[in-house]
Design a protein with these regions (language model features):
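C-terminal output helix
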Residues: 111-120
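Active-site beta3 strand of CheY-like receiver
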Residues: 49-55
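Short hydrophobic/Thr-rich beta-strand motif most characteristic of the beta2 strand and flanking loop
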Residues: 30-37, 45
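Charged docking surfaces used in two-component/phosphorelay signaling
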Residues: 20-28
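Receiver (REC) domain active-site loop signature in two-component systems and cognate sites
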Residues: 60
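Conserved acidic carboxylate
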Residues: 13
Length: 135
C-alpha cells in the first residue's frame, strides 16, 4: 500500500473560534493542521514543525502578522514556505503592506473557502483536495 504525504498547514490566528473553524475546514479538506495564537507562537511553530504552507492573520497581540512574516522570510529555515495573509482589513494599502512584508497572497475575511483551497493547492502543487461538505 502506497502512503500519501499529507500537506502540513500552519494557521496563525488569535481569535479561537475563527482558528478552530478554519482548522476544521482545512482538516476536512485533507490537510494536517497546526495552529498558533499569535505571531510569536507562529514563528516558533513554523521553525519547529516546518509546515508546507502558512496562513497568517495580520492583526494579533504580542506580534502582528506583518512582523512574523518578515521574521519568517529572514530565516533560511522558513524563508521559502508559502505564506497566505488573511485579514479583516480589505484596503489596498494593507494588502500591499502584507505583500511587501513577504506574504505570497492576501485574503480578506470572510474567506471564500473554495478560492482559498484552490490557492493553497496551487502553492502546494496539488491538483485537487476534498472540499468540505456544506451543512
Amino acid at each position: 500500500m502506497e502512503l500519501i504525504a499529507v500537506s502540513k498547514i500552519l494557521y496563525v490566528e488569535d481569535h479561537p473560534a475563527q482558528r478552530d473553524i478554519m482548522a476544521q475546514m482545512l482538516e476536512l479538506s485533507g490537510y494536517s493542521v497546526a495552529v498558533a495564537s499569535d505571531g510569536v507562537e507562529g514563528v516558533d511553530q513554523a521553525r519547529a514543525w516546518n509546515p508546507d504552507l502558512i496562513l497568517m492573520d495580520l492583526r494579533m497581540p504580542r506580534m502582528d502578522g506583518f512582523e512574523a512574516i518578515k521574521i519568517l522570510r529572514s530565516d533560511p529555515s522558513t524563508a521559502d514556505i508559502p505564506i497566505i495573509a488573511i485579514s479583516a482589513w480589505a484596503s489596498a494599502k494593507h494588502k500591499e503592506r502584507a505583500l511587501e512584508a513577504g506574504a505570497d497572497e492576501h485574503f480578506t475575511k470572510p474567506v471564500d473557502l473554495s478560492r482559498l483551497i484552490e490557492t493553497i493547492n496551487r502553492y502546494l502543487k496539488q491538483p485537487e483536495s476534498k472540499q468540505p461538505e456544506s451543512s
